[in-house]
Amino acid sequence: MDFNLNDEQELFVAGIRELMASENWEAYFAECDRDSVYPERFVKALADMGIDSLLIPEEHGGLEAGFVTVAAVWMELGRLGAPTYVLYQLPGGFNTFLREGTQEQIDKIMAFRGTGKQMWNSAITEPGAGSDVGSLKTTYTRKNGKVYLNGSKCFITSSAYTPYIVVMARDGASPDKPVYTEWFVDMSKAGIKVNKLEKLGLRMDSCCEITFDDVELDEKDMFGREGNGFNRVKEEFDHERFLVALTNYGTAMCAFEDAARYANQRVQFGEAIGRFQLIQEKFAHMAIKLNSMKNMLLEAAWKADNGTITSGDAAMCKYFCANAAFEVVDTAMQVLGGVGIAGNHRITRFWRDLRVDRVSGGSDEMQILTLGRAVLKQYR
């Protein structure tokens, strides 16, 4: 088994290091986090490197580099302090439209390639339908040759500034036998109200409540096939959970290295605190968790590239990495002491971000349920 990166992957990682060393990005990230602003200038710099084309097929002008390459890039970005959670739509967002969208929809989304701007996101969660997706109440109703969308969504990522949202709704004409379909919605349409929510972490990406009051659509705005909404988003959930896990690992690695540098230079009782056995124990446990996360993620990326990744794999990565990474960051904060809880150290941002990730993108509890079912299914 060869864990070395290939030449193309090494070039991407080297490019990431060069970009992150080109200026004081941390000051920019801190400002964006404080003001809850999407770091568009940073994402544009990544797009200029071709990061938003990593998974796009070659026939569409992409690199088709694969998930192991995505993993290598995400891990390095995270290790160097970048908020990779704002990039979730970059690796697969274009491919989703190339696979499911009409030509008109594809053209609208592909126009954002290389810009660094937010382009679209899914709107599924509702006040009464979180993990219980089958309880969705938002409806679409056909009338006089048009389609009307009514209902409300909540905790919808990126929706304060994305020009398009793909909304999951149920057929209002079929109350007894629910039919779930997605619709491609231009956020400038009449009847849409957006309320931005404050969050503990992940502040560089918006989170909103959205209401739809007789929002008028056309049949051509259907996204994918009618009644195929759940099947389509299942794949998106797995993709998102893998990316969340990559983000968690990278962030934890950054916190670990910050704490290690501090432990080797912080002197108490006449010597660096890194020489104290209690501190060494903390680093041993952090290193075990980081190594376990990395190996799990690389295996999942390899499976994704070979078409064998399952929902159980994605759930395992999401659950383990969200929890292990938070534990690493929390321990690193303990090593930093007062420096980590007062002032402007970036570990406070990491701590807030990773606590949110145990809920965002699928709660811990739902990952356990998904994984448990997948494990037992193998032995039936």
Curated annotation (Swiss-Prot):
Listed PROSITE patterns: ACYL_COA_DH_1, ACYL_COA_DH_2
Keyword set, alphabetical order: Cytoplasm, FAD, Flavoprotein, Oxidoreductase
Subcellular location: Cytoplasm
Pathway(s) this gene product operates in, as recorded in its UniProt entry: Amine and polyamine metabolism; carnitine metabolism
Catalytic activity: 4-(trimethylamino)butanoyl-CoA + oxidized [electron-transfer flavoprotein] + H(+) = crotonobetainyl-CoA + reduced [electron-transfer flavoprotein]
Molecular function via GO: acyl-CoA dehydrogenase activity; flavin adenine dinucleotide binding
Cytoplasm found in the keyword field: yes
GO terms of biological process kind: carnitine metabolic process; fatty acid beta-oxidation using acyl-CoA dehydrogenase
PANTHER family on file: ACYL-COA DEHYDROGENASE, ISOVALERYL-COA DEHYDROGENASE, MITOCHONDRIAL-RELATED
NCBIfam families, sorted: PRK03354.1 (NF002885)
Subunit and interaction comment: Homotetramer.
Record-given protein name: Crotonobetainyl-CoA reductase
Lineage summary: Bacteria, Pseudomonadati, Pseudomonadota, Gammaproteobacteria, Enterobacterales
Gene: caiA
